[in-house]
A protein has these predicted regions:
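Divalent cation-coordinating acidic motifs and surrounding scaffolds
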Residues: 1-206
Length: 206
């Protein structure tokens, strides 16, 4: 399947469902090395099949090891050079984050990573990239909004209207992304933005 078509860049965003390279057995993600190997093989195969120039991930382990592993797999499996955005953090239990892997043959980072910590920290970020062939710059915002699981109260309660629980939190997160866009676009010096992620928003969402 040709997903690129006539476009010069292909961007992919994916929830990796707790991609952990350590801190196993917490009830989230793999319980051991064998399970991680299976997850890694499936994820890496899927990413190589897509063969995007830029990947945004959510539910990938904090720290740099998980991103480095997938960048190395993409380089090996596609014959192109991939790198990742190092946010300077370290692994902290089974906590996950939003992260970036990009083809350094095609793109280069423009400016530093920007954080939006409305809600859970490390799950909403923006990074600008420059396309080497054209010099064009764009912002890529990767986000993971609050899920519908659990019981909420107040504006987070399930109102029975199809939005499920924690709609209030998701609305606040969505507004925060829009609010951060102004300062992010000023910082990067460019207004073109691509917003992607697991927003946990379905047809009935506000």
């Amino acid at each position: 399947i040709d997903m690129r078509g006539e476009h010069t860049l292909l961007v992919c965003c994916m929830n990796l469902e707790y991609y952990l390279v350590e801190n196993w057995g917490t009830g989230y993600g793999p319980d051991n090395q064998s399970e991680h190997n299976k997850q890694r093989a499936k994820v890496s195969k899927a990413l190589a099949k897509i063969n995007a120039d830029l990947y945004g991930f959510v539910e990938i382990e904090q720290g740099q090891s998980a991103l480095a592993e997938l960048a190395a797999d993409l380089s090996k499996n596609t014959g192109r050079k991939f790198s990742y955005i190092n946010d300077g953090g370290s692994a902290n239990g089974s906590y996950t984050k939003a992260g970036y892997v990009y083809c350094s043959d095609v793109l280069e980072p423009h400016g530093s990573l920007r954080y939006n910590n409305e809600g859970v920290d490390n799950r909403k970020k923006t990074q600008a990239f420059r396309e080497k062939a054209t010099g064009e710059v764009f912002l890529y915002s990767v986000n993971h909004f609050k899920a519908k699981s659990g019981k909420g109260s107040g504006d987070n309660a399930d109102k029975g209207d199809g939005q499920g629980t924690y709609n209030g939190d998701r609305v606040r997160e969505a507004k925060s992304v829009l609010n951060h866009y102004g300062s992010d676009s000023y910082y990067y010096g460019d207004e073109d933005i691509l917003i992607m992620g697991d927003l946990n928003a379905y047809a009935m969402e506000d």
